[in-house]
């Protein structure tokens, strides 16, 4: 079974309070997905989903995304083993963003750098220039080793 999504209602009240899930995909056919840890609420990543990725996520309970750089569907954790089991899916008021609450398998890391979250740096100003500072040095796995094993 593959879910399909009806076109969003033009009636704002229906879109915001009605029972129909009608995601508002952008002009490229994507919707933004915000992903947090279901256990502690930590922000893990922000990604994009097309209709197929969203349908697979709902149907399988495992997070799937659409890679804009590769222009392809991607099952999160397929290479690293850090799959995301979806505990809850929410949508925002106008259904143009998705919030996934997940538990991460494997090394409990979401970022391809080996870190738990893709948000491991803070942004600030130093000598009048915007700079980033790494605030999470801990890597749950060695990306060179994990991704080399999958390629080999």
Swiss-Prot record:
Q: Per UniProt, where does Mg(2+) bind?
A: 92, 94, 96
Which cofactors does the annotated protein need, by name?
Answer: Mg(2+); Zn(2+)
Q: So what does this thing catalyse?
A: 1-(5-phospho-beta-D-ribosyl)-5'-AMP + H2O = 1-(5-phospho-beta-D-ribosyl)-5-[(5-phospho-beta-D-ribosylamino)methylideneamino]imidazole-4-carboxamide
Q: Respond yes or no to whether keyword Magnesium is given for this record.
A: yes
Q: How cofactor binds (record note)? A: Binds 1 Mg(2+) ion per subunit.
Q: Which InterPro entries match?
A: PRA-CH, PRib_AMP_CycHydrolase_dom, PRib_AMP_CycHydrolase_sf
Which pathway, per its entry? Amino-acid biosynthesis; L-histidine biosynthesis; L-histidine from 5-phospho-alpha-D-ribose 1-diphosphate: step 3/9
The EC number(s) this enzyme carries: 3.5.4.19
The family assignment reads:
Belongs to the PRA-CH family.
The record describes its quaternary structure and partners as: Homodimer.
Official protein name in the record:
Phosphoribosyl-AMP cyclohydrolase
Which lineage do the record's taxonomy fields give for this organism? Bacteria, Pseudomonadati, Pseudomonadota, Alphaproteobacteria, Hyphomicrobiales
